[in-house]
Amino acid sequence: MTIKVGVTGVCGRMGRMLVEATHKAQGCMLGAASEYPGHTLIGADAGELAGVGKLGVLVGGDAETTFRDADVVIDFSVVEATLAHLRLALAQGTPIVIGTTGFSAAERQQIALAAERIPVVFAPNYAVGVNLLFKIAAEVAAVLGGEYDIEIVEAHHRHKVDAPSGTALGLGQAIAEAVERNLDEVAIYGRQGQTGARDPQTIGFSTIRGGDVVGDHTAMFMTDGERLELTHRASSRMTFAKGAVRAAKWVVEQKPGLYDMRDILGFK
């Protein structure tokens, strides 16, 4: 069976890479592609935009058609668009892979409610290496976390609009769970002024924005006399695209539920 993958926001950087990754993956093909109404590239061949040649799939201006024509849709866009696409997925009964970040707690709850009716993959990062970092960092935290200060440092390109990154928050959540802390209660997002001594229960987040950095994430475990650092550096967005396509191929076989890359990689 060949899976028909739909891609929203297909003219953006991630959208084009998702088309390329879908075209190169075994067992799937590009089934539909869309952009926001009025986009200048509506009507163009999505394959040509992605540099893989004509695929016969034209960029549409109606996302509803994408969800109707595809077996599964991958959405890397912005929060407002993703929530609108989620409603289309519900209406069509189409599984969806969400790569958008920056959701509020209430918006994440909307995604969880949708997953009661359709299969949803919602992950902060689709790179296999990053998800291994989550797993390894949690294991390290379980051993060291009670005695070590924990800090997370992330860096991204100048155009990223949310901070800390969804990946940094996912890393923090994995670590917090391992040391039996509530991340909402112990997270410190940057420091300035007379902050006082560090509370050993906190997990600090530092954000760097600049240049064309695809994504760097480091978990630091520090105590007197030593420091352990675990780092993942992404050099190409293609690693995210490949992971998302892998997730799309997996989720079409699943029953309704909320999944992440740990399910796909067998970490749970």
UniProtKB/Swiss-Prot annotation:
It catalyses: (S)-2,3,4,5-tetrahydrodipicolinate + NAD(+) + H2O = (2S,4S)-4-hydroxy-2,3,4,5-tetrahydrodipicolinate + NADH + H(+); (S)-2,3,4,5-tetrahydrodipicolinate + NADP(+) + H2O = (2S,4S)-4-hydroxy-2,3,4,5-tetrahydrodipicolinate + NADPH + H(+). The active site is at residues 156, 160. It is found in: Cytoplasm. It comes from the Bacteria. (S)-2,3,4,5-tetrahydrodipicolinate binds at residues 157, 166-167. Belongs to the DapB family. This is 4-hydroxy-tetrahydrodipicolinate reductase. It comes from Magnetococcus marinus (strain ATCC BAA-1437 / JCM 17883 / MC-1).
